């Protein structure tokens, strides 16, 4: 039995490539049908992700959402949550309002106004220079985990990343580290790719080059290789 933890966007799912989506989803179904464990690990919240999983008929053993702040089993029971500190939220919101940035708080399922039940702050931002400036400003004034994705700047608790979430999952569910493989394409995949056996998508963030991981054209190709070895 093998355990595969895969990033979602631009690894499993592509907005602009339905044919690749179809091939990846078929490969995932085959992987799970053969008794393997499949975990999706993503920056998306549970609600957004679940809608796409249903629409594309994607099976899973575990979901790790919000970059590791929420962990679910295949019954959608939440195994673990890491909230942002209320004081951190207040400090960050103050900075955001100083600069008049567009943002929302996320509780892991939906937008929220509750500072006591927030796992992520999301700042809407598309321009690359603006994203870098936003990250730098917040890094200088707070102690949180912050990174830029394609259309957002994402802020989570300082202890949260995909690597730590996978370590938690393995301990909670008594899984075998030696059977774990990971795959991703972006900088929020860096820690898990550095720590576990795995691969990167051919189209990936250049920051992952230093890890020296084998590149794959599609998730389907990687799954087929795992199943044949």
Regions found by a protein language model. Give the residues of each.
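Hydrophobic/aromatic beta-strand patches that form the interior of the parallel beta-sheet core
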Residues: 39, 64, 181-183, 199, ...
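Non-catalytic pre-domain segments flanking phosphatase-related domains
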Residues: 1-6, 26, 172-175
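The start of beta-strands in P-loop NTPase/AAA+ ATPase cores
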Residues: 2-4, 61, 180
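Conserved Rossmann-like nucleotide-cofactor binding loop
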Residues: 11, 46, 188
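Conserved acidic, metal-coordinating active-site core of Asp-based
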Residues: 95-195, 203, 210
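Asp-based, Mg2+/Mn2+-dependent phosphohydrolase catalytic module
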Residues: 176, 195-229
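Asp-based phosphoryl-transfer active-site loop
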Residues: 2-18, 193
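Active-site phosphate-binding/coordination module
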Residues: 15, 19-109
